[in-house]
Amino acid sequence: MFCKLFYENLIIIPALNKRKTLLNIDEVRKNIILKEGLYYFDYTASGLAYKPIEDEILKFLKTYANTHSDSSSSAVLTQKCYENARAELKSLLGLDDSFYLIATGQGATAAIKKFQEIMGIYISPATRALIGEANLRKLNLPLAIIGPYEHHSVEVSLREGLCDIKRIELDENNEIDYVMLENTLKQNAKRNIIASFSAASNVTGVKTDYKKIYSLIKKYNGILALDVATLSAYENVDCRYFDALFLSPHKLLGGVGSCGLLAIKKELCKNLPTFAAGGTVKYVSRTSHVFTNKVENLEEGGTPPIIQLIRANLAYKLRNEIGLNKIKEAECELGEMFCKELEKIDEVINYCPENLDRLPIFAFNVKGISPYDFAASLSSEFGIQTRAGCDCAGPYGHDLLNLKDNAIFEAKPGWVRVSIHYMHTKEDIKYLINAIKSCIKKHKKR
């Protein structure tokens, strides 16, 4: 199922759409940067570059300078552009004044690490060895509760962090087992609970009822973080129903090369940086130092990701100027079309549940053919870019493929993932379906 500035006469963060009306998808499509002959169906891994955004970045670079200085006009302008981008992003994402927005690293993984640093969960292997496992076991560790669809960046990092971890499994309907979740919360009611759930699977596109999860987590005074790396390319989440958000703007159209983003409730942050560096201090003498009281700057030590944040802002602005409703409508139509045609192919094993609200992301295998060989054939013979593997969601993959933990495999298990995007056309979908059928026939003859 699909869908149940002007500053001193200079434009700081310009609107991509001067007419103040929703952009036409056909016109947007013409400005995607993609080599002729390639068909891109890998948007869940990364978006593509967009020429008007690259043009705006080139304009901005004419007065570029590092931040953290009030003595030169270029530095002042760059600082204003940077902070303006942050402010606009908060608005584009629907964040209210109870949140900080921190730019970090290259994607959601960096946001996850920053969140764990702020919450005291992240610990380096060297620090762990220095403290010793025996001493660590004496600590009153928090319980981290995760969902069944989590990316390795969430699950593996928590396994290695200063916390105990509990994975909520799938129920008989292939969605989150809410009974198991509430029982886990009841059994650990006196503990410090930090929950992290993916808002949408990057494998099957299945959406999470994050409002329901939030209500359960808050019933037991827990904290809820949402991984929206997959979802936020298409829609926002209501800021009343989470405490932290992990975002990956590079997955948006035009977001290539942008930074990761962490939205986090102000009440969760301290007045000390997780890493003390240049840009986090107001004054440093030979014997002492004073940190800035601006928390967002505290967590962006050193040169901040200036171009990356501005690019992220432009990508989200493009998303909103296309229109979230228009995006949803296009993806519903194209997703339904692909799903119906895929189901007609007898050799295809489709792992995406039919009864759940989800994004048009498909994971499938072809009987008797390696997903890696199949994806390579689509690419080499038809120019179709998909992705084969487990999509950094191994535990969920074990559920989908009915695999036993720690089993020995002749080849790495996986599937072919296809991401249907609102920039695709019906002709693109037909081309993809015909290519899948053709590849199946060719492999059968071998």
Where are these regions (language model features)?
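Pyridoxal 5′-phosphate
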Residues: 6, 12-446
